[in-house]
Amino acid sequence: MHVERRWSAALLAAGLAAASLTACSASEDKVPSIGYSFDNVVNNYNARTVDGAASGARQAFTRVQVGFSYLGPDGDALSDNDIGTVAVVPGDVLTLQYTIAPAAKYSDGAPMACDDLVLAWAANSGRFATDRPLFDAASTAGYSDIASIDCVPGSKDATVVFAPGRSYQNWRALFGATDLLPAHVAARAAGVPNVVDPIVAGDDGVVSRIADFWNTGWTLTPGSVDTSLLPSAGPYRVDSYTPEDGLVLVANDAWWGIPPETQRVVIWPKGTDVPAKIADGSLDVIDQGAGAIDLGSTEGFETVTEPSRGVEQLTFATQGALAEASARRAVAACIPRTDLFDTLGHPGFEAPPAGPSSSVVDSRLMQPDTLVYPSVAATVGDRYQRSDLDRAGKELAASGNSALTVRVGYLAPDARRSQLVSRMATDCAAAGITVEDASSPEFTPSALRAGTVDAVLGGAGSLPGPTGSASSVVARYSLRTGIGLNVGGYSNGRIDSIVDQLAVTDDPERVLALATEGENILWNDMPSLPLYSEPRTTVVSDGMQDVVANPTAAGAGWNMDRWVLLK
C-alpha cells in the first residue's frame, strides 16, 4: 500500500497509537530480529569526523551512542533524560549544568562520566590545532562557542560555560546522540589515565595522540571489527559486522533504561541488494531517498513518501575549473531547477502551498517553513529558476572560458540523482558546458577537496543519505571557512561573520537582515546551488509496530529500540 503524506505529526501520532498495541503484545508474538536498511554506507563508529559525517554512522548508532538529546521527526532536538539532565544556570553568560544519570555506564562496565563531554568538546571545538586542526571534525557549530568545561575526571557532573556574547541558540542539540564517544577508550589508546587532564592542560603531545585515535580509531571495516573499541551507552550495542550478515546490533544488557522491545536489529547499509533482501524476508524497514533504487516487489509493505529537512543541492569546488565565481554561476544558470523540482522534487505527493517541497529551495541559510524564508528567498528573484542559456554563456565568457567540463560526484547507485545529472548534462551542453556523471559506490564528499570532482550532489555539506534538521545551523556552518564539511573550500569573511551571528540570535528582524545579506553574497559567489527539499521514502513491512518516519539526519532508526515485528 502506498500512502501519500505531507510534513505533519501524522506519523508520530500513528507511532504513538501503535505503541498502545505493542504494549498488549505478548513476547511470544514478537519476531526476535528486525532488518533495517538506509541509503548510506557504514564505515565509521564516529559520526563527527568528516568521513564519519558523510557515512551512515548517525543513522546506524543513534540508539547505540545516546546523548542528552536526540533528533525527533519534526527536526527538533528533544531531551533524552535516560542519560541525565541539563539545566541553564542563571547569569549573563550562557552556562549549562550537565548531570549524568548515576546508573549510566557503557556496555564494557565503564561508567559514563563528564570525561565524555570534555572529549566531545575538544574534538569538535576546533581549538586544538597546529598548522591544521588536530581533530578532523565535520563541524564546530556550537562547540566552538564553549569557553570551558568544569569536569573532575570520572565525575557525573559538568559545568559548560560559553564565551561572552556566544549564547548558542541550538544548545539543546549539543552532546546529543552520536556526539558522545567513550572517552575511556580514547584515553586507553593514547596511553593516559583520562582525557580530561591533558585537554585542560593543553598538552599538545597527548592531545595529538587522542586526536589520532578519535580521527581513525573508530573506522569500521566489515569482517574485521574489534568490538572492544565500540562500547555502547545505549539500548543497543554492536555485536558483529560482516558483509554476509550485515551490521548486527543486539540489546545492551548494561542499559539502565527501558529495555529495547526487540533483541536484535540487523542493519544493511548502502550497497546491499535491497530487492533481494526484501524477497528473502531479511528487511522490514527501509529508509531511502525517494526513487533512489528500484525496490522490486513491496507487497506486504506500507510506503510513505514525504519531504525531508535535507535540501538536495550541488556543492561546487572553488578550485580548478570552477575557481571563478562566474564559472560557478554559468553552471547554475544552465540548470533547470524548477523543472527538476517538478519531476523529481515531490514524487508521489502533491507539492504543498508552503514549506518543504512546495517549490525549489531559494535559501541556503533558512529552512523553507521559517517565517523569514519568503523574504530571504526573494533575494534570488527570477534568476536561476530555469535553464538560461544566454546567462550561462555570458557568465562562461566572463570566466575566461569558451567551454567547461564539470564532473558531478555522488554516492551510487542512485537512480534519482542519475536522472538529475543526466538532465543537467542535456540542458548545459547547449551552453558549452559538459556535465559528466562521476558517481561511484565508493564516492565520498572528500573527493571535492581532493579535486577529483568539480561538484557534489547531496545534502548540505555534500552529505549523502538522510540529512537536515529544523535548525539550519549545520547547513550554514558548511559554508564557513575551515569547517570540515566545507569540502568545496569556500571562504568569505562576511559569510563567516553572518553564520556566527545567526547561531546566537533569535531576533526575527536581525535574522532577516543577516540572512538576506548572506543570500545576496551567496547567490553572487555561488559556492552551492540549492535545488529542493529531498523527498524521503520509508517502507515498513506489515506487522511492524512503532516505526515512525523521521525525515531528518537521524533517519527512521531514531527510535529503533521501540520497534516490534509481530508474527
Please give the residue ranges for each predicted region.
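Periplasmic-binding protein-like
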Residues: 322-372, 519-527
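N-terminal lobe/hinge region of extracytoplasmic solute-binding protein
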Residues: 37-91, 122
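Extracytoplasmic/peripheral linker and loop segments enriched in polar/acidic and small residues
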Residues: 341-344, 351-354, 380, 436-444, ...
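Gly/Pro-rich hinge or "lid" segments in bacterial periplasmic/extracellular proteins
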Residues: 179-257
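Structural transition elements
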Residues: 348-398, 412-417
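Long beta-strand-rich cores associated with HINT superfamily self-processing modules
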Residues: 540-567
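Surface-exposed binding/hinge segments that line
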Residues: 137-215
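Ligand-site clamp/hinge motif
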Residues: 241-296
